[in-house]
Regions:
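Signature for the C-terminal beta-barrel architecture of outer-membrane proteins
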Residues: 17-32, 46-54, 69-71, 107-113, ...
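Surface-exposed, well-ordered secondary-structure segments
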Residues: 88-103, 107-108, 130, 135-137, ...
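Histidine-anchored nucleotide/phosphate-binding helix
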Residues: 57-63
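Subset of outer-membrane beta-barrel
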Residues: 76-94, 122, 127, 138, ...
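Cleavable N-terminal export/targeting peptides
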Residues: 1-27, 475
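C-terminal functional modules
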Residues: 415-431, 435-445, 450-455, 466-475
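Surface-exposed loop and membrane-interface regions of Gram-negative outer-membrane beta-barrel proteins
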Residues: 46-51, 65-109, 173-177
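Conserved, mostly hydrophobic/aromatic
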Residues: 116
Length: 475
């Protein structure tokens, strides 16, 4: 468990519902204004000084009908991050404005939508289950200071939907060192084969431009990311809803709105089963080539299987996923940066399985739950070169920019997490989420000097206890 759990990953926004690929809310019947305030406090390790707090403000506005079938809407979504004693930094969270058009002959959930994201667009991405989603951010390697605006056009009909989107990140040209706008294209479609069965597919292409090393002139020197994602989903009975686990929604800009949306318990049985996969190819510098500036393609893979069941007020959920190390660092690729993995590296994918249950106590508005997760972390074995400091220690890849070494000759070990959760719905105006978890991570290490004064990797404490608290009000 790392401190990234409570970083910018946990975000609150309007967007994709858990049962659809759409990134937009339902069509409003009339004008609507809502303010949403959220406070998040957490400590991923009570024994370490890494406690964090965040405050989020969101204002959502939707107009009544402007013309026949035409509505407008906008959302301002901002984080207020504390700095020093009394300072704060504002961080945009995919604020947007747009138009929604629905002819009178269309069904209520059908529409043509145009959405503009003027600052950032983390709600536009590939994949579905959050641990295996990608393309939220184009690149962390050469990102500029001018944001990542985007434009999306989406058509939703009763049996199918499709979208096309363009992101325009400001990235540094590796050859000229100047900032320039690059283009990231995303397309996707979904079709309901029956009321229960749905198929979805999408693709993305991002040209990052010239790399930061000399290369032979021509387009073959550009660094790019291209990939496809697909999902098959089966649903039956009453809506199940999402499980209560912040750790599984790292980087998801819609989790908190989906989580605090009113859940329904009409009685009876409901099921949601989905299988998805992604294949991504990146053109990077060839780490093994003797030709300076040579390029090579590197593949990245991910897959996930999710099952959620509901019986009256009891919900059961399970999630298993697979991610290669190259997939986990798509936005910040390479060892070193923007380079392929060395051929002598043995790459072990991350494997994770989570099972849990919760029960809704209607008289209290309380939903207590418990879950268990086992994870084999992604690992790079053999030589892992670092600039000016080559090491042969196995490297644990924990996230896009989070790594840790194992002692030489050591093997990765499974990470066990047990977590108790509680969701408390206070009518339609407020909600509380509390988590308390225990993690046993045998891969925890630190650095210490040996007898000769040289820093070496040594084992650290395996046991971690932490917790999170989220409070949200709406008016």
């Amino acid at each position: 468990m790392t401190s990234s759990l409570l970083a910018a990953s946990l975000i609150i926004a309007l967007g994709q519902s858990p049962e659809s690929v759409s990134t937009e809310p339902a069509e409003p019947a009339a004008s609507f204004i809502q303010t949403r305030l959220s406070f998040l406090a957490g400590d991923t390790d009570f024994d370490a000084p890494d406690a964090t707090t965040r405050f989020h403000v969101a204002l959502d506005a939707r107009t009544a009908e402007l013309a026949s079938g035409l509505h407008a809407e906008a959302a301002v979504s901002v984080f207020i991050n504390p700095v020093a004693v009394s300072g704060a930094i504002l961080q945009d969270n995919a604020s947007f404005f747009g138009l929604r058009y629905r002819p009178s002959s269309w069904a209520p959930d059908e529409r043509l939508a145009l959405t503009v994201f003027p600052v950032s667009a983390t709600r536009l991405y590939m994949g579905h289950e959050n641990p295996v989603a990608w393309a939220r951010i184009s690149s962390l390697t050469r990102t500029g200071n001018d944001g990542e605006p985007a434009l999306e056009l989406r058509l939703s009909r009763r049996r199918w939907d499709a979208f096309v989107a363009a992101k325009l990140p400001s990235l540094q040209n590796g050859a000229t060192q100047e900032l320039e706008r690059r283009l990231m294209l995303l397309v996707g479609a979904g079709v309901n084969l029956s009321p229960a069965l749905r198929l979805e597919a999408g693709a993305a292409n991002l040209d990052l431009g010239p790399g930061s090393r000399p290369y032979i002139s021509g387009r073959e020197g550009d660094i790019y990311t291209r990939g496809v994602s697909g999902r098959v989903m089966w649903r039956h009975g009453v809506p199940v809803g999402a499980n209560v686990d912040l750790a599984l929604y790292e980087g998801d800009p819609t989790f908190f709105e989906r989580f605090f949306a009113p859940d329904v318990y009409p009685g009876g049985f409901g099921a949601h089963v989905a299988l998805e996969g992604s294949y991504v190819s990146q053109q990077l510098f060839d780490s093994d080539s003797t030709e300076w500036g040579a390029m090579r393609k590197q593949a990245a893979h991910a897959a996930a299987l999710v099952t959620r069941l509901k019986w009256d007020r009891l919900r059961l959920h399970a999630l298993a996923y697979y991610r290669t190390p190259s997939f986990m660092v798509l936005a910040n690729p390479g060892f070193p940066l923007e380079s392929t993995l060395y051929e002598q590296m043995e790459s072990l994918a991350e494997l994770s399985a989570t099972v849990g249950a919760d029960y809704f106590l209607q008289d209290w508005g309380l939903t207590p739950g418990f879950l268990v997760r086992v994870t084999a972390p992604a690992t790079l074995k053999s030589l892992v070169p670092m600039p000016m400091w080559p090491r042969s220690n196995p490297l644990i890849v924990r996230g896009t920019t989070s790594y840790s070494y194992l002692p030489e000759g050591a093997e990765r070990s499974p990470i066990l997490t047990a977590k108790a959760t509680a969701r408390w719905d206070l009518g339609e105006v407020a909600g509380v989420l509390a988590e308390l978890f225990y993690t046993r991570d045998p891969n925890q290490t630190t650095f210490a000097n040996d007898d000769t004064g040289v820093a070496v990797v040594v084992w650290d404490s395996q046991d971690i206890v932490g917790g999170n608290l989220l409070f949200q009000v709406r008016f």
